[in-house]
């Protein structure tokens, strides 16, 4: 009776509602039955667990809370990684390997498109036609610093209003003996003088990106029209952002394959039309739609690649696709030098997507998505197609996947939209944390890139366009190689935390320590000089670019793993759109002539500190089965970053540990004496 009174005081008496779900992500027993673990752990390295099924009722029948699970499909069919994928041979099947290879090949074409702005919109040296190239050195010019560097954002350009007059003057004076018609160096002009210097009817250009003509030189996007270059950069990024959000939702509703194929068709239409643009307005508008379609291709291929792989192979197969895209980045300068004209380059970038039209006949729908959305009739046909391609005997179905599938053929499909995540307890928090991480990583990358390239006058190596380009590409390559090693030993959450700490340290040291060095450098006896400050700044910038690239890439991959299959494309769309917003800060700062850059850096530095705390709230998904529905995703609970010591009891007990305590009430009602040390919550530890 004492136990009954304690139960009623705790809210368990008659007429009372059951307690809400626990804070660590577990659901009440009624909901847990419908979302039981599908295969449990797939490997020893994970920290997140999906809660097991509730036990049978002591009377022999089903537990009362299991009644809601009567309408649910067979758990064998929802256990894709534990039942369906092994039946198909895992990644060992020849057909699965072919499909993975088909997701790698387009990454090269995607790399070409992502890095094309560095060449199409590079701001060249320019001077008034007829005045001779020497006029360029007299300050009637602007020297751009390249367009988009890397798949993050565009590197800063020096607008005309802030052109380096002193450096140009030194070059002009030194070359005055050779060029007798070179006019004397004017004093740094004010705003009105810049307008008069731009009063020219025709321009000559010195393009540094391997092309004879690009978008800037074709339509004279200099001086008063220079802002249109940044709008053109906006158009592709804004198209990517909207594309990620919209195509992600559509792919969860109609499937990955239709979105992929329609995106291929329309990127061919819009991409080839870009090369036929008659003015910069048409160019920018078509680039928006090109970015929209490119987002659909990137997102669906990423999801298909994840859903094809078993737990132990997901990360490495994703990284191979990243390396293929980087190969496109490294090959772009040679492609530009081969084409010579921006229209030919644009057409050559888009034409390889013609090969992807063959995917309509050779690339199937995601079997994992068909099973998760209960489209069992289509799933059965696809399973038989897989067994035929792999030359497998369907009679080798030990677990009985095909018989269970035939029992569920009459079930109606159950599709889910990403907006359903708003009603969850843990899943929406995980997605928001990863969106903020992605936004911070991609956004602060521009701060580090601008800081490093801002020393190009003092570092001769960085004055060259190709040196800038390949330096950024090499940092990204080294970052991906480091990710492979770190994630292998520390897992997804540990690796993300390490790279975010490095990003925060590089940012804070660059903002704080360099200002301190700058103060000491004013004293001649301090031993500090501006060269020391510049070297520290370049070092911190390289470390920051290295770490922030890993943060952004790992956040996207992490989101793809912890988001359930039924809304995976929608979740990926959110985190990729956040990355796009981070990239968008670069052309915004450039459009305002670098005004607000320091505040921009401070804001992102503060975000890194917030992200370090929030990363600890994420689950660990290494070697875990992918969640198939929203209930599975809710059961990915956060665990301590370091494992428990042997014999140490965790503070928060799971449902699996609490389920055996229900017999205490029956024992007390029967008048049995409780053993010594028994309590209402179980046995007291001795």
UniProtKB/Swiss-Prot annotation:
Q: Has UniProt tagged this entry with the keyword Membrane?
A: yes
Q: What are the UniProt keywords, alphabetically?
A: Glycoprotein, Ion transport, Membrane, Transmembrane, Transmembrane helix, Transport
Where found in the cell? Membrane
Q: Which CDD domains does UniProt cross-reference here? A: MFS_SLC22A23
- What are the BP-aspect GO terms? monoatomic ion transport
Q: List glycan-bearing residues.
A: 24, 279
Gene3D superfamilies linked: MFS general substrate transporter like domains
What membrane topology is annotated for this entry? Multi-pass membrane protein
Question: Matching Pfam families, A to Z?
Answer: Sugar_tr
Name the GO cellular-component terms: plasma membrane
GO MF terms listed in the record are:
transmembrane transporter activity
List residues traversing the bilayer. 234-254, 258-278, 288-308, 315-335, 344-364, 467-487, 494-514, 538-558, 569-589, 598-618
Region annotation Disordered: where it falls in the sequence? 1-62, 169-193
Main localization of the protein?
membrane
Q: Does Transmembrane helix appear among the keywords? A: yes
Q: Which family does it belong to?
A: Belongs to the major facilitator (TC 2.A.1) superfamily. Organic cation transporter (TC 2.A.1.19) family.
Record-given protein name: Solute carrier family 22 member 23
Upper lineage ranks? Eukaryota, Metazoa, Chordata, Craniata, Vertebrata
The encoding gene is: SLC22A23
């Amino acid at each position: 009776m004492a136990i009954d009174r304690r139960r009623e005081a705790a809210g368990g008496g008659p007429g009372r509602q059951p307690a809400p779900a626990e804070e660590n992500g577990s659901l009440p027993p009624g909901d847990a039955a419908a979302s039981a673990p599908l295969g449990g752990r797939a490997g020893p390295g994970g920290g997140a667990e999906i809660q097991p099924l509730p036990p049978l009722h002591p009377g022999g029948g089903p537990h009362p809370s299991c009644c809601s699970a009567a309408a649910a499909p067979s758990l064998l069919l929802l256990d894709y990684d534990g039942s369906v994928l092994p039946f198909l041979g895992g990644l060992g099947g020849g057909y699965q390997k072919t499909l993975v290879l088909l997701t790698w090949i387009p990454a090269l074409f995607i790399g070409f498109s992502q890095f094309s702005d560095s060449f199409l919109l590079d701001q060249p040296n320019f001077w008034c036609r007829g005045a001779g190239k020497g006029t360029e050195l007299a300050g009637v010019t602007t020297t751009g610093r390249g367009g988009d560097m890397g798949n993050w954002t565009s590197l800063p350009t020096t607008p005309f209003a802030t052109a380096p007059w002193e450096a140009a003057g030194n070059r002009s004076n030194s070359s005055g003996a050779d060029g007798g018609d070179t006019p004397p160096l004017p004093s740094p002009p004010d705003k009105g003088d810049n307008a008069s210097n731009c009063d020219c009817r025709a321009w000559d250009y010195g393009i540094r990106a391997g092309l004879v003509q690009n978008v800037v030189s074709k339509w004279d996007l200099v001086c008063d029209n220079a802002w249109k270059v940044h709008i053109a950069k906006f158009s592709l990024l804004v198209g990517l952002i909207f594309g990620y959000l919209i195509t992600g939702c559509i792919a969860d509703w109609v499937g990955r394959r239709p979105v992929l194929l329609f995106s291929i068709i329309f990127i061919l239409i819009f991409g080839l039309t870009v090369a036929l643009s008659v003015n910069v307005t048409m160019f920018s508008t078509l680039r928006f739609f090109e970015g929209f379609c490119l987002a659909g291709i990137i997102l669906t291929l990423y999801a298909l690649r994840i859903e094809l792989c078993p737990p132990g192979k997901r990360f490495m197969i994703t990284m191979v696709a990243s390396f293929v895209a980087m190969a496109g980045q490294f090959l772009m300068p040679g492609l530009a030098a081969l084409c010579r004209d921006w229209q030919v380059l644009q057409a050559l970038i888009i034409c390889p997507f013609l090969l992807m039209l063959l995917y309509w006949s050779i690339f199937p729908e995601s079997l994992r998505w068909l099973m998760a959305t209960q489209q069992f009739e289509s799933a059965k046909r696809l399973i038989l197609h897989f067994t035929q391609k792999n030359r497998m005997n369907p009679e080798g179905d030990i677990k009985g996947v095909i018989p269970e599938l035939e029992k569920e053929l009459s079930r109606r499909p159950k599709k889910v939209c990403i907006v359903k995540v708003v009603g969850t307890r843990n899943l929406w928090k995980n997605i928001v944390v990863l969106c903020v991480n992605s936004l911070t990583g991609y956004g602060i990358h521009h701060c580090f890139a601008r800081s490093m390239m801002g020393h190009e006058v003092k570092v001769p190596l960085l004055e060259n366009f190709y040196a800038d380009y390949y330096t950024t590409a090499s940092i990204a390559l080294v970052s991906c190689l480091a990710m492979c090693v770190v994630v292998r030993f520390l897992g997804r959450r540990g690796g993300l935390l390490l790279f975010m700490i490095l990003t925060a340290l590089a940012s804070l040291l660059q903002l704080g320590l360099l200002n301190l060095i700058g103060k000491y450098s004013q004293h001649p006896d301090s031993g500090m000089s501006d060269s020391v400050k510049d070297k520290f700044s370049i070092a911190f910038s390289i470390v920051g670019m290295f770490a922030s690239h890993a943060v952004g890439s790992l956040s996207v991959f992490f989101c793809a793993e912890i988001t359930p299959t039924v809304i995976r494309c929608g979740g990926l769309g959110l985190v990729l759109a956040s990355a796009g917003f981070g990239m968008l800060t670069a052309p915004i700062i450039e459009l305002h002539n670098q005004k607000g850059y320091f505040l921009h850096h401070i804001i992102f530095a503060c975000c890194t500190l917030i992200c370090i705390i929030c990363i600890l709230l994420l689950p660990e998904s290494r070697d875990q089965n992918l969640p198939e529905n929203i209930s599975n995703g809710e059961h990915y609970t956060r665990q301590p970053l370091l494992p428990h010591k042997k014999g140490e009891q965790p503070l928060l007990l799971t449902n699996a540990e609490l389920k055996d305590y229900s017999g205490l009430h029956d024992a007390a009602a029967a008048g049995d004496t409780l053993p010594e040390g028994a309590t209402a919550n179980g046995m007291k530890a001795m």
